Amino acid sequence: MTTQDLLAQYGPRESMEYDVVIVGGGPAGLSAAIRLKQLAAERDVELGVCVLEKGSEIGAHILSGAVMDPRAITELIPDWKEKGAPLTVGVTEDKFLFLTETGSKSVPTWALPDNFKNHGNYVISLANVTRWLGQQAEALGVEIFPGFPAAEILYNDDGSVKGVATGNLGIGKDGEPTENFQLGMELHAKYTLFCEGARGHLGRQLNDKFKLREGADPQVYGIGIKELWEIDPSKHKPGLVMHTAGWPLENDTYGGSFLYHMDNNQVVVGFVVGLGYTNPYLSPFEEFQRYKTHPAIRAVLEGGKRVSYGARAITAGGLMSLPKLVFPGGALVGDDAGFLNASRIKGSHAAIKTGMLAAEAAFEAVQAGRTSDELTAYPESFKTSWLHTELHRARNFKQWMSKGLYLGTVMVGIEQKLLGGNVPWTLHHQHWDHEMLKPASQCKPIVYPKPDGKLTFDRLSSVFISNTNHEENQPAHLTLKDPSVPVNVNWQTYAGPESRYCPAAVYEFVKNDDGSERLVINAQNCVHCKTCDIKDPTQNIVWVTPEGGGGPNYPNM
């Protein structure tokens, strides 16, 4: 049944009114909520603010490296140390290695551009920092609704955004209501801030409806895959931050790794692959597993135990790929717009800062008696902020690196180290990631080694330790515009790339009795990384929100 059918039979939906509704309980959304309530307290005015979060709890779906620049969180909550923020492991040492298959070359610290240096930053679990931000928001009176995904944008008669509706509960696989059916709820607001993270489901719709991407470069993405390990205490160096480039990726494939030493004898190890890669046989997950076999990495992990796993797409386009940030009734904030600084491999500080800027614009608009118009003060304040300066200096990073590791490294070194990012030229992204795959007939198949179950693993055992769970009796949230495309186009032309780019074994080609192929979608495995929505060559796969509370539950990630 369609939404309209359900409303006709079971409606109308209940509704709640707020001054500001925030979609997404990550660092951007929670920072916006906190800033709104801070301003309301300073002015001694009432302000209704709510946050919708699709995860089962705040932090459940948050995955990042992460090394945090504390500049933005210090602006938001100056006494964060006294309030117990989980930023406790300061960076003690930076290492950067270029890897070959069996060797490595270390870059001296003095030769690293400033954007690769992390003195004054903290090795964190962004999931735990987000949980702490949630506590700060609730203490200020923000209403937070975990397990309630925003599934639909609501519009006023004049076309401006009115708010959002949460997803229905109790729809069966056949699309019909079950005995547990409940209609979603409408949340109306004067302004709605969309903070869904990279490749936001509703953000995509807003980009299309309001033509927000006109004049912007294509957005480009990476897939980040991460594991949490407990290692031998004798190998543990709290605060050590290591990045690598090179092997196992080919020169023309953008990507690299991170290995951060946290507290409690734990390290996080991860791998990022740019989704503009061309060979359909490439598997980002398998490249990550192969990377861990390098002597420099094996030496750290061997004898340890893998604790958790996750994956998430990240925006990498930078300043030139930012869309228009505002539209009548709302704004895109954080990675829903694409504020991550790829040259620093950091986005949490940008999410917090843009959350604050959007909140300040929304607060002033509400106090002025405005509603449902464009929050033009938000992009204006961004353009005069330190964040804009930072992103402007790094605006060519991804473009240079997409030209190959060697040329990219030289040019980034010249721009960032010698010239401090102050260059008169600007490079542009020309293509979307989904346009980049070559036909399989033009590419060399890649044979990956089998996992050993100690250092390297398969995808199903990895998904298991991501604590991913979905209600089984619900429609698949990975939808196909045309069910014939996976076999007739993706399998025949590209050798079924969705079976490789997905880090959770969601997509599986199996043989029918007559020997033909068909695609099976194991939606219950989905870790909500959004890679399929980005990389599918014909954009036939569309990720939509599953029933609330579904997906991963990342501890300490």
Walk through the language-model features, giving the residues of each.
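Extreme N-terminal leader/targeting segments of oxidoreductases
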Residues: M1-V21, R35-C50, I171, N469, ...
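Glycine-rich Rossmann-fold phosphate-binding loop(s) that bind the pyrophosphate
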Residues: G25-G26, L126
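N-terminal Rossmann-fold NAD(P) dinucleotide-binding loop
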Residues: G29
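Predominantly flavin-linked oxidoreductase catalytic cores and closely associated redox partners
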Residues: V45, A127, R131-W132, Q136-A299, ...
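N-terminal FAD cofactor-binding segment of flavoenzymes
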Residues: E46, K54-G103
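FAD-binding beta-loop-beta segment adjacent to the flavin cofactor pocket
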Residues: A311-A342, S462-N473, P486-Y501, E508
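Active-site-proximal substrate-binding core of FAD-dependent oxidoreductases
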Residues: G338-R344, M356, E360-L405, V520-N522, ...
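Iron-sulfur cluster-binding cysteine motifs and their immediate structural context
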Residues: Q492-A523, K530-N553
